[in-house]
């Protein structure tokens, strides 16, 4: 029967150096524990170990080997294994099998990078699990991109053709994904700062409304307001007196509101005031 083992580039696992041919474990074999032993798996279980490396070893078990198959585990172990050949994981012909690929991306979104024939269904399943696997999508559709940014707004970084709808979905999920928006509109910026006031730092064209909404969501966003008005500063310190530290021009009214909200904010009052 053909078995497999996923290996890293160094082909070293738990201090054991694997090689082509016969590999013999240096530790005493114990069939009562998963510890020690040289592990391997069936073809259908390779998917459980994709994150362990980029190499795939084709394994057979010598007749004289001591073997233990673990129930409810996706692996087995032996005191010796024979590695017939080692290939790059990306070159495995199973990546041409659509059903196999679909199952793979459902377990590891980034395995999309190995899929030879990417279908929209496969890509959608990949980004549902890991939004950043959008990076590996060869033919991006709006549907795939929307699914990705709904999972993580930061996936917008990998969207090749941004639409306003995609950008809005991204900043609704994570306001700071505004940093990846190529064409900012006031609506997109407002959505972004309403989700996370700190997104104001990425707004290219600040308006009074955008700044006001930003400090309403997060008073510390006052730090990023380029044109501080008394109204905006008051909104910030009314919510958190400590926001006084970001006020450039401290008026008496602002100071009073700040210490009223938090007496300890007085430490940010200039002595010379």
Predicted regions and their residues:
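Leucine-rich, hydrophobic repeat-scaffold detector
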Residues: 93-100
């Amino acid at each position: 029967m053909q078995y497999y083992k996923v290996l890293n580039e160094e082909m070293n696992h738990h201090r054991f150096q694997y090689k082509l041919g016969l590999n013999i474990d240096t530790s005493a074999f114990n069939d009562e524990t998963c510890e020690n032993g040289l592990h391997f798996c069936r073809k259908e279980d390779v998917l459980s170990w994709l994150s362990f490396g980029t190499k795939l070893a084709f394994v057979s078990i010598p007749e004289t080997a001591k073997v233990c198959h673990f129930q409810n585990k996706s692996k087995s172990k032996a005191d010796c294994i024979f590695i017939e050949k080692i290939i790059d994981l990306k070159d495995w012909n199973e990546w041409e099998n659509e059903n196999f690929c679909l199952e793979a991306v459902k377990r590891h979104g980034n395995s999309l990078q190995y899929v030879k024939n990417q279908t929209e269904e496969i890509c959608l399943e990949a980004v549902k699990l890991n939004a950043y696997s959008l990076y590996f999508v060869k033919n991006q559709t709006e549907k795939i991109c929307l699914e990705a940014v709904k999972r993580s707004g930061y996936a917008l970084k990998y969207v090749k053709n941004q639409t306003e709808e995609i950008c809005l979905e991204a900043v609704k999920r994570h306001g700071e994904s505004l940093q990846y928006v190529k064409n900012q509109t006031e609506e997109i910026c407002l959505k972004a700062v309403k989700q996370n006031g700190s997104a104001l730092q990425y707004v290219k064209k600040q308006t009074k409304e955008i700044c006001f909404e930003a400090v309403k969501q997060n008073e510390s966003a006052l730090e990023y307001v380029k044109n501080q008005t008394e109204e905006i500063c008051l909104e910030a310190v009314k919510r958190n007196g400590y926001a006084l530290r970001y006020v450039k021009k401290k008026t008496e009214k602002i100071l009073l509101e700040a210490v009223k909200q938090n007496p300890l904010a007085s430490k940010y009052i200039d002595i010379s005031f």
